[in-house]
């Protein structure tokens, strides 16, 4: 496990002395709930009007309490059968001990608890209803040690029952398990796909596991592109950090968003992720309440997002070109109808590709549905002096620093190596080369004057823009059955896009 800092014996002594001194001088405060509003923030609810203000304050609760502000204390003791609720988005830190018995200890949606020992809790996750004829998926995770079986009591099963869906991903077979067909319990450390036609609040009741946890990954080579696909969830009752790149599910659309390890972004409680194992020996991952490390000399990345042109704000897919070491993340397509933007390295498709420096970077793109798409390209955390997008099909050369959005028509027949990102103005990309590379004779198009080892693809279209032929340049092309007329040849290499007209008689 990677450590965020090193603690030497001398530091241990210093820390111990500090803790002893702080605890010795800590004040005891009692929550009486005098006003009846139950609010922690209201000083009138505290004995003598004294709210706890120190990180080692000893707090006794003598009435039901609502934590409506961020709190950092030493101990928390329930003096009766009282309840505690941490409101949505608020944080409760208890540095030493909690004595709460079996009484309700509730964390509302995205509330956080930082406490290193096990504690019996109820943790809530708010679910927004999906619209008619569509599913707004949620990638959810259980933050308690015990298995949670979906029921009407914990909000998973609603009325009418048919309007919710819950799936578990089986890493062994790369297949989905439908809860309605094969019921299952939610396990700590795993993530699940959930949607509901009604607004609902899921409740996870059980015992917390502290502030860090290890989760195990699996790898099954026989599953092809999904060999290392693992649905892993935040197992902690607080925002947590992972020690690798991962995917989250967009809150606005059914798309998965790649998050680079170097960004040190946190994952909300009750939220799932998708991870990729690189092989049989890559079999564990760590979650922690604090970052595992901070990148020195962070270099940023270029983000590429794709959306349908009719709704450019609704991101359908995304890829990152990272300039930080160790951010690589294998490409996973979760939804069959989504477009796919990605990089390829050593025959492996990547959602995040780490590079030291680059002059030109091929960018691949595929669609499952013909239509108009908008690609948005934006450097983040990095000053870029020159960045152009080259469309290998149309020959367009776009300065994305001036025009970050590029709208284009895509077909399922287009070759995947459609785009290039160019970072050097003198790279020498020629949109059209005058030198002919092909000729037609007796029903055959002959390709010559080409270094075929550098060729990405050959595409031939008719004057109506229909793709007649597409493939790698491996020889000559037969025109048997083609309609006589003018055809456009587009030859894409790693450095050029060459175009030529040919008349077939």
Where are the regions a protein language model picked out?
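Short, compositionally biased serine/threonine- and acidic-rich segments at solvent-exposed termini, linkers
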Residues: 396-428
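C-terminal outer-membrane/trafficking sorting elements
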Residues: 359, 364-367, 433-505
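Bacterial Sec-dependent N-terminal signal peptides
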Residues: 1-30, 426
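Proteolytic processing hotspots in large secreted/extracellular or virion-associated proteins
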Residues: 27, 347-383
């Amino acid at each position: 496990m990677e450590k965020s800092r090193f603690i030497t014996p001398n530091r241990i002594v210093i820390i111990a002395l500090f803790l002893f001194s702080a605890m010795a001088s800590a004040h005891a405060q009692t929550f009486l709930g005098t006003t009846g509003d139950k609010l922690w923030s209201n000083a009138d609810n505290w004995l003598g009007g004294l709210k706890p203000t120190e990180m080692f304050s000893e707090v006794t609760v003598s009435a039901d309490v609502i934590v409506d502000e961020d709190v950092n204390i030493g101990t928390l003791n329930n003096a009766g059968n009282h309840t505690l609720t941490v409101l949505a988005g608020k944080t409760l830190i208890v540095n030493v001990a909690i004595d709460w018995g079996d009484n309700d200890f509730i964390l509302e949606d995205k509330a956080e608890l930082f406490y290193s020992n096990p504690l019996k809790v109820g943790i809530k996750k708010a679910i927004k209803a999906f619209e008619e004829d569509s599913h707004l998926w949620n990638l959810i995770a259980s933050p308690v040690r015990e298995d949670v079986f979906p029921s009407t009591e914990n909000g998973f099963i609603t009325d009418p029952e048919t309007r919710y869906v819950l799936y578990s991903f089986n890493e062994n077979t790369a297949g989905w398990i439908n809860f309605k067909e094969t019921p299952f319990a939610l396990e700590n450390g795993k993530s699940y796909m959930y949607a509901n036609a009604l607004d609902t609040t899921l409740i996870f009741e059980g015992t917390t596991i502290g502030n860090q946890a290890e989760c195990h990954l699996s790898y099954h080579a026989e599953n092809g592109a999904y060999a290392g696909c693992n649905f892993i969830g935040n197992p902690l009752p607080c925002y947590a950090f992972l020690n690798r790149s991962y995917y989250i599910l967009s809150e606005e659309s059914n798309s998965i968003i790649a998050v680079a390890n170097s960004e040190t972004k946190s994952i909300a409680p009750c939220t799932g992720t998708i991870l990729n194992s690189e092989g049989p020996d890559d079999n564990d991952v760590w979650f922690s309440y604090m970052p595992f490390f901070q990148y020195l000399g962070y270099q940023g990345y270029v983000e590429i997002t794709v959306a349908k042109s009719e709704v450019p704000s609704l991101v359908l897919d995304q890829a990152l070109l990272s300039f930080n070491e160790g951010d690589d993340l294998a490409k996973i397509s979760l939804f069959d109808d989504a477009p796919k933007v990605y990089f390829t390295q050593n025959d492996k498709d990547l959602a995040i590709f780490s590079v030291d420096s680059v002059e030109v970077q091929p960018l691949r793109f595929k669609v499952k549905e013909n239509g108009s798409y908008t690609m948005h390209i934006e450097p983040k955390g990095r000053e870029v002096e020159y960045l152009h997008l080259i469309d290998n099909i149309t020959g367009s050369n776009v300065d994305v620093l001036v025009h970050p959005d590029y709208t284009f028509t895509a077909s399922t027949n287009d070759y995947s190596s459609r785009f290039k990102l160019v970072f050097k103005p003198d790279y020498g990309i020629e949109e059209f080369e005058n030198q002919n590379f092909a000729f037609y004779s007796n029903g055959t198009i002959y390709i010559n004057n080409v270094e075929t080892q550098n060729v990405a693809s050959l595409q031939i279209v008719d004057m109506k823009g229909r793709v007649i032929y597409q493939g790698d340049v491996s020889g000559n092309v037969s025109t048997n059955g083609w309609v006589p007329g003018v055809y456009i040849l587009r030859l894409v290499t790693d450095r050029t896009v060459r175009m030529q007209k040919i008349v077939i008689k």
